Amino acid sequence: MAAKEVRFHTEAREKMLRGVDILANAVKVTLGPKGRNVVLDKSFGAPRITKDGVTVAKEIELEDKFENMGAQMVREVASKTSDIAGDGTTTATVLAQAIVKEGAKAVASGMNPMDLKRGVDKAVDAVVEELRRNARKVTKNDEIAQVGTISANGDTEIGRFLAEAMEKVGNEGVITVEEAKTAVTELEVVEGMQFDRGYLSPYFVTNPDKMRVELEEPYVLIHEKKLSNLQALLPVLESVVQSGKPLLIIAEDVEGEALATLVVNKLRGGLKVAAVKAPGFGDRRKAMLEDIAILTGGTAISEDLGIKLENVTLDMLGRAKKVVVEKENTTIVDGAGSKTEIEGRVAQIKAQIEETTSDYDREKLQERLAKLAGGVAVIRVGGSTEVEVKERKDRVDDAMHATRAAVEEGVLPGGGVALLRAVKALDRVQTENPDQRHGIEIVRRAIEAPVRQIAENAGAEGSIIVGKLREKTEFGYGWNAQTNEFGDLFEQGVIDPVKVVRTALQDAASVAGLLITTEAMVAEKPKKEAPVPPMPPGGMDF
């Protein structure tokens, strides 16, 4: 086991504080509409330019082990806020730095760290309660656009695209962000359920111009296994032919005589049919087939259920208003499933999202949820260079999470003003001793930090701005850093989601509380590099 270094008391806190400052100072320059960019060196390719706090935080690794511990703890604040709210990472970092700085001073002056932490926790609870009480619900489309614009650093085009996407796919719908092949940013909305499997044979195509299959009001046969035996498939094909409707077959695979017969029937005009492979793999495939069955009001034919293909009747097949099958995608529009069953399935998937610990599983579950609940919107981000596209994509991601959060819990005045106004809630907090009271004062000072930083990044004097804001008592009155004007921030469209502000404060206080109460630090001793042996003298034998 390698030897360890141990640091105690003030020395430990000083080292940790230095690490916190290095990381926070690099992150906080990005805060606000006039925040600056940070350039990140990449071991390959062009450097990356970003204004996203969590991206900057994740790049920082310090040489000194003890300083690095402090930096990594604050990086955890940014990551946690990003995971929960998707935005507000820079605000969380600024708040954490402010609480840690004030807390370390108090501990150095002889106060009890545990009481300070209790005071900080009480203060945060009171402020969060005040924020929730003053929240406004977001209902109008232009309010959603404003939230997106603010989070995308004043880019109105991004705000508009996000509002349009949310209007079309609903709050549960999936909005994905991709890099465009052109310089133009565009929005594409896929209504209904789409999965990434295309037709098994080009002979199924009904629209040769667009090379796709279009089936109006088809039956949908959902089968879990491979279909190769024609005899098992004949009874259901005959029933569909008699009904005069088209048929979509979704199965693990369709091959051999079964595929040949379907193609021949289609070409002779006897039956309008298309076959596609089932989406996903393993257990996920089973779940997705069940989703399609619920959406179309059919039954997923599976041996687990004891249903044989030859016994399938028309009422076991799903129905849809329209199905479009392209080379690589299948879209089912307006499935005939019952609303209550779809809602039940949505609730079930939501519960699984809450329980899962895997990010990959969560992402896949959210995709399934969106396909059932609304649809999928794709924002393709364009730009002149690869560096510009990546920077813009970061901002679109932030803005997308912020708009979702705004719809969920409502909005507050932006620019750090909501936290400043929530200070009055601290006067009502009861404490048991002077050290807890000091913990509350730490939070009182710390929640000014975002306003000060936004002002300083915009070239103004932070303390003057804070002083002017304190003169007025209206909750929405604040300073717009973009226009350098004072006024009602709700009217000016400078708004932040409650969830983002709340999460930033709670996560910052949580990690800062741990740092304040740290009394010892243990790290591995740096290994001394062995000196390189000298080169032997060159030979003289020539």
UniProtKB/Swiss-Prot annotation:
Q: Which reaction does it catalyse?
A: ATP + H2O + a folded polypeptide = ADP + phosphate + an unfolded polypeptide
| Record-listed E.C. numbers | 5.6.1.7
Q: Where in the cell is it found?
A: Cytoplasm
The UniProt entry, under Gene3D superfamilies, shows: GroEL, GroEL-like equatorial domain, TCP-1-like chaperonin intermediate domain
Which keywords appear in this protein's UniProt record, sorted alphabetically?
Answer: ATP-binding, Chaperone, Cytoplasm, Isomerase, Nucleotide-binding, Plasmid
Question: What's a GO biological-process term for it?
Answer: protein refolding
List cellular component terms (GO): cytoplasm
Q: Carries keyword ATP-binding?
A: yes
The enzyme's first-digit EC class, named in words, is: isomerase
Coiled-coil intervals, chain numbering: none
Q: Give one GO term, molecular function aspect.
A: ATP-dependent protein folding chaperone
Q: What residues bind ATP, as annotated?
A: T30, L31, G32, P33, K51, D87, G88, T89, T90, T91, G415, D496
Q: CDD domains, per this entry?
A: GroEL
Sum up the protein's function in the record's words.
Together with its co-chaperonin GroES, plays an essential role in assisting protein folding. The GroEL-GroES system forms a nano-cage that allows encapsulation of the non-native substrate proteins and provides a physical environment optimized to promote and accelerate protein folding.
Q: Which family does it belong to?
A: Belongs to the chaperonin (HSP60) family.
Q: What is this protein called?
A: Chaperonin GroEL 2
Organism listed in the record? Sinorhizobium fredii (strain NBRC 101917 / NGR234)
Its lineage opens with: Bacteria, Pseudomonadati, Pseudomonadota, Alphaproteobacteria, Hyphomicrobiales
